[in-house]
Amino acid sequence: MDYSLNSIEQCLQIMDKMKLMCNEDDDIEIFDEALYKVRTEADMSAIERLCNILDDKTEGPCSAMEDILNTIFYISEKYKQLEQGIYIFLSNSYKMIKYAVDWYEMFHRMVLWTPNLYEYYISAIKRLDKQNLEILLHTLHNIKKEDIEKDNGKNFFEEKVDFIIKSIK
């Protein structure tokens, strides 16, 4: 099948169509080409669409979904709007929790691993409506609960999650 990657909209449509990588016409190389074009040419308006492409049921390499998360950060940073990019992601929590809970959680883990994002993350969280805030807090609680290091029983994310929660109250 011939796919046209002439516009950002076409790229996003192709990615959305192929996100599960379970159809005969789905092609990871085309998906990656479309994502690369979005990454290099899209503006902040593409972030919400990227959130909707994330899906836990993808049969393709998980790197494709991870690349979407990285693209969200990349676009936000490129336009010097990290807080807004994070906010757009977080304000779609109620949608993503239905079909991309693993990738939603991965986004938070990526932020927790990157202390220089905390300021933007905390500011974005403070802007959330109640529904999205509850989902986020539940997710942070799960991350904190699940990540006990096996060697010494210490929770790697506990201090980081506690800091974030304390900072938003």
What are the roles of these predicted feature ranges?
Residues D2-N6, K37-A46, E59, I72-Q84, ...:
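Alpha-helix capping and inter-helical loop/turn segments
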Residues I8-L12, D43-L54, K78-S93, L117-S123, ...:
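Amphipathic alpha-helical scaffolding segments comprising HEAT/armadillo-like alpha-solenoid repeats
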